[in-house]
């Protein structure tokens, strides 16, 4: 019998706010444990939450990016459960009136994955297990960090579709300025709800939830493993238990964590300390008007205007920084082809050599365009351009100033170049004779000797012209 896998995803993204959703503690990643906390996010008695309006605005922006409808009034609810990383013993979330509903993401195949809703909530803390101390430690820095939970419908049927959905959703959230979606820092986390059923059947099977997925590769492996596990159980006549499972990517297997709760288990009720959130149509339109260009529109513009290949476009769209760098570089140098080549080939090489990631890059995006102009005008050669670009990327150097200070500009003094060529010809009479006898390889040898004599500070085209004139 053939089986169909049915997948729905719950994706949590951290919103790009400076402070937490209900207090003024910073959201910065990587602080010393339990230093970004206050009585509000620790849930101490007598404290009251104050809603961060920036979190609401970013959530509306996310909803608009995915084509959601924005609720004119939404509200918060308390989700009650006990866990060590949740000091209040409840999480402020949205169940009954979420902010955004009925959006979608379209895959390359044309298939639409529906988004049921997006709702705001606060993050919990983080548990860290210390084998040396034989203790589990709690870091509450993450408590109260604003999250947007994006809940899809169960519209995906393979690991590949689920990963593509995650990639497109991440791209959408990053380019709309909602979240940096860095999985390694936990600012994008995905829970997988999965069931299997005989092909052609409409009734859904018993689902499990998979957690601890810290990369798209882990998500793909976990989906394939869980689908195979459930099919094996069905074929053996065993019952699938509705449960939450933890994925161990190193071992390539999942383990039961706890029985899967239903909504009723959390005893939701309206949050009494936060009034309903009203969003006027005028505010929604203001946010829409200030939205950055979204990925689909940017891809279409590049391919229509610059005739970029899909491969080049995909690489340039790997981060908002490289996309902006391409647009700014093209505007300065006028050549989309040159801009794409430097960003897609030279930039990764520089980053690798410096042990940096694209997130570490922090240079003036116009610098590359100015550098390409210097190369095109003959002020520097390509080898020098590569050296200067490395300094631009790693030290935010200004190309023209760096070239001037380090004497890297090409010689433009025709007399000096011709003097060097004459010396080379006098020292290599045999090669000169070979060239005059029709051996073209000798000419290339002479160009190399001239370039060496000039210390590489002349263009090969200028040297070739002088050599032809004097030989």
Locate each region found by the language model:
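Strongly charged, low-complexity linkers/loops
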Residues: 358-369, 373, 382-452
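Structural motif
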Residues: 330-339, 379-380, 437-441
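Active-site lining segments that contact anionic ligands and/or coordinate catalytic metals
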Residues: 263-265, 297-299, 311, 353, ...
